[in-house]
A protein has these predicted regions:
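Asp-based, Mg2+/Mn2+-dependent phosphohydrolase catalytic module
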Residues: 2-56, 71-72, 78-152, 156-227
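Hydrophobic "anchor" residues
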Residues: 65-66
């Protein structure tokens, strides 16, 4: 029942659509959709370098970032990278913020969040607003640090990346694992936003917001593992 409600609700994200519309006319809004770091998946990210540069906490999206859509198991190929992140930051300083598990609209009693926590061994933040709408107080209360000291990792430009950039996080964009299990409207939205943000970045030269972590020597390789 919950999965059905989540799939239906995720077919429309008003805040994400508003972000896209704003980007058409406002350069500053476009910048919020551009990630600081892009990687195929979490395996490409240098978690120790991020920690050395001053990052104190890491926030992950769940679906198509760590798991298949609506699944509870880590994708096998990223399990090692997730363990590296937990080791670099400490398990208490890593959490999931999802538009499914933990979101009051679809998971008011937190039962799905509890299941995810048991399966993934990682806290799931309970929150009231769907990304990219922000609740910085929930994050600072959970982690005990400023949002500017956090990293946001996700697969969507107009939800995960915009959510993180709105709060001054360093944002990491990864590629989705699969469209299988997602509603057709979600796949269409991903296709559209990828091309829209790609146009902003390529043709308009839109850059992400400046971030202090890039002034640290640990940013030598832009927080990507050396190949």
């Amino acid at each position: 029942m919950l999965a059905g409600r989540v799939r239906m609700g995720q077919s429309w994200n008003g805040a994400g659509a508003a972000g896209a519309a704003g980007g058409l006319v406002r350069p500053a809004q476009r910048a919020l959709a551009v990630p600081h770091v892009s990687a195929r998946d979490p395996r490409g990210v240098d978690w120790r370098a991020l920690r050395a540069a001053g990052a104190r906490a890491c926030v992950f999206d769940k679906d198509n970032t760590l798991t298949d859509p609506y699944a509870l198991e880590l994708r096998p190929e990223v399990a090692g990278a997730f363990a590296e992140c937990l080791e670099a930051f400490g398990a208490r300083n890593v959490a999931l913020v999802s538009n499914s598990a933990g979101l009051a609209e679809y998971d008011p009693e937190g039962k799905e969040a509890d299941r995810v926590e048991r399966e993934l061994g990682c806290p799931v933040l309970r929150h009231a607003l769907k990304k990219p709408e922000i609740e910085p107080e929930a994050l600072t209360r959970h982690f005990g640090c400023a949002t500017e000291e956090m990293v946001m990792v996700g697969d969507r430009f107009l939800t995960d990346v915009m959510y993180g950039n709105r709060m001054g996080m360093l944002t990491v964009k990864v590629e989705a694992f699969t469209g299988s299990g997602e509603r057709a409207t979600v796949r269409a939205a991903r296709w559209a936003e990828t091309r829209l943000v790609g146009f902003w970045m390529g043709s308009l030269g839109t850059q992400p917001p400046a971030h202090a972590f890039f002034s640290h020597p640990a940013a030598e390789h832009s927080f990507l593992k050396k190949s």
